[in-house]
């Protein structure tokens, strides 16, 4: 029986893995290393991987003449100009995936891999458009994406599967917080997770694509060429040009020097005939020490550490309380980064993966092999008028796979239509398993729907439709039945849980409505209040001054005022003594309107 594969499509390197019949992870790599994510076009010929990287003549990520380095970075682009040829990211990525699949097919001697179906990993910050583009490119390359999985989540599951008994390890970490991050060539991706009843549940995600190792390689190359120029007293005008194709060779040596300095104090970078000159001036011969390397990368490393601190601060988690910090990616092998991580998390919690360039791909392959499902980690909530919360999609809801979608519909009513707008505010709890009314929330965003301002409160119905598609994008659409002007928003920053062990569903714990107690701590600020409710009889959600107007207009349909509504109404009444609006001690009569 053939197995679905896991694909790690990375900015710098990419890899396909599969789980063999013996229960072992097999990687279809390039002589022990992942395939460089590089595509080169020479006429009608498409060259990918190491051969394309070795022909690079320019530095950087993106389109470099007739070569695309890191096509993943182009997922948000409409079109790209590759040496005069107008192409789309879909075309370039499809060409590269075809190369990966063909190489894996040639290496799959035992015919164990179903290379047409895959679990594909994505960065935590990849938006909806990027996911759609990636799925289309995979399909054009003959690969059906069964589901997308965040890269750190796949890495964590790969780590657990490497342990002698996965279930025992999950049981040990049950109820504990785990941080996993992938600090590779292109990005730094972080995921804070909690192990809950055998499932790996995401608490908070964060990503940064400006602190990857590729930027460090470029910085090392600049340092080396600058040192060579100083060595021979070159100025900007007298500096010799580099020979064609030599920059790619030097960047490879800089990358290797970075790896070597993880275990040694110094290394030599030697490359003959780099410059168009004679004798020693033409050859690069520079010694690079670990101390120098650390000074070169100090700013970039500090930015990465700041990203970790920001995520933990936002989640209100002390790094010393983490049960495990799993660090993957090539950058974490640098001694200076190891030391900073050890100081922050402690020796017992920190685990630096020895297979940092393979663990994400292997984790995706294990997810495919074990037929794991993704579920919603936190409830998707709608804020109602008076700050109550309506759970639209419950936590633990199974998320769609290829060709599937889930849809929820809800009828709502506008409690205050005077400005012609119904405001939908979508929220989620900040922490998993903490969805009580007083627990802190994080906003997804808001959706504003045009309504008829002349309608009485709670009369015009608004139909809200929430859909999650197989790209794990949430689509919120709403339309008022009188104005019939549709409004829509998309949210891609959902948090997932990887359901390793299915827990019994206790439906008694699921509550359709929660009362939110507004947290008034912190600085005073302006905020938008929702003005919708799903209950047509919730007259307590109507603003007091508006309810007074309604009662005066519809004498035989009057509704009783609550204490809160009465206070609201009073605030908008002028002083009985001087006629002033809301103001304390506004006149000599002693009348107080506040």
Regions found by a protein language model. Give the residues of each.
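Short, acidic loop-to-helix structural element flanking the phosphoryl-transfer center
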Residues: 90-106, 307-308
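Conserved glycine-centered beta->alpha loop in an early N-terminal alpha/beta scaffold
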Residues: 84
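Oxyanion-binding/catalytic loops of NTP- or PPi-dependent enzymes
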Residues: 1-72, 81, 108-571, 575-581, ...
């Amino acid at each position: 029986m053939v197995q679905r594969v896991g694909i790690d499509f990375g900015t710098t390197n990419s890899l396909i893995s599969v789980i063999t019949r013996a229960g072992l992870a097999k990687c279809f790599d390039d002589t022990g290393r992942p395939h460089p994510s590089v595509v080169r076009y020479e006429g009608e010929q498409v060259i990918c991987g190491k051969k394309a990287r070795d022909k690079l003549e320019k530095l950087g990520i993106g389109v470099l003449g007739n070569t695309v380095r890191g096509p993943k970075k182009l997922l948000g682009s409409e079109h790209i100009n590759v040496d005069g040829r107008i192409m789309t990211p879909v075309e370039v990525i499809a060409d590269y995936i075809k190369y990966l699949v063909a190489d894996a097919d040639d290496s799959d001697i035992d015919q164990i891999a179903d290379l047409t179906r895959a679990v594909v990993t994505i960065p935590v910050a990849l938006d909806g458009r990027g996911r759609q583009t990636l799925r289309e490119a995979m399909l054009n390359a003959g690969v059906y994406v069964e589901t997308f999985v965040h890269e750190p989540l796949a890495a964590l599951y790969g780590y657990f599967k490497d342990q002698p008994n996965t279930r025992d390890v999950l049981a040990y970490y049950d109820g504990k917080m785990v941080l996993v991050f992938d600090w590779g060539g292109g990005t730094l991706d972080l995921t804070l997770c909690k192990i809950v009843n055998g499932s790996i549940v995401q608490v908070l995600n964060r990503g940064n694509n400006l602190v990857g190792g590729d930027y460090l390689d470029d910085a090392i190359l600049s340092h080396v060429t600058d040192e060579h120029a100083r060595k021979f007293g070159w100025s900007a005008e007298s500096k010799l040009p580099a020979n064609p194709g030599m920059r790619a060779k030097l960047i490879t040596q800089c990358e290797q020097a970075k790896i070597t300095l993880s275990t040694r104090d110094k290394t030599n970078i030697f490359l003959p005939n780099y410059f168009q000159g004679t004798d020693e001036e033409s050859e690069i011969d520079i010694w690079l020490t670990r101390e120098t390397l650390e000074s070169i990368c100090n700013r970039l490393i500090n930015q990465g550490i700041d990203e970790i601190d920001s995520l933990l601060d936002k989640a209100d988690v002390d790094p010393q309380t983490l049960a495990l910090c799993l660090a993957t990616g090539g950058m974490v092998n640098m001694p200076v980064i190891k030391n900073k991580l050890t100081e922050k998390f402690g020796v017992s919690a920190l685990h630096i993966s020895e297979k940092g360039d393979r663990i994400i791909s292997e984790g995706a392959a294990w997810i495919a092999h074990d037929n794991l499902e993704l579920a919603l980690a936190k409830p998707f909530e709608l804020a109602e008028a008076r700050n109550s919360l309506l759970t639209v999609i419950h936590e633990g809801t199974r998320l769609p796979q290829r060709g599937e979608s889930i849809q929820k519909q809800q009828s709502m009513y506008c409690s205050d239509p005077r400005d012609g707008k119904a405001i939908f505010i979508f929220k989620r709890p900040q922490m998993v398993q903490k969805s009580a009314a007083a627990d802190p929330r994080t906003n997804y965003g808001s959706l504003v729907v045009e309504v008829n301002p002349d309608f009485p409160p709670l009369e015009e119905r608004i139909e809200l439709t929430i859909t999650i598609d197989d790209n794990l994008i949430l689509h919120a659409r709403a339309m008022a039945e009188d104005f019939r002007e549709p409004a829509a928003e998309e949210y891609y920053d959902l948090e997932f849980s990887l359901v390793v062990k299915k827990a019994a569903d206790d439906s008694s714990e699921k509550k359709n409505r929660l009362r939110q107690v507004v947290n008034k701590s912190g600085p005073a600020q302006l905020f938008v209040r929702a003005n919708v409710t799903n209950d047509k009889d919730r007259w307590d959600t109507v603003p007091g001054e508006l309810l007074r107007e309604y009662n005066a207009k519809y004498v035989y349909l009057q509704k009783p005022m609550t204490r809160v509504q009465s206070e609201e109404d009073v605030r908008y009444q002028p002083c009985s003594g001087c006629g002033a609006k809301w103001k304390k001690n506004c006149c000599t009569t002693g009348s107080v309107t506040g």
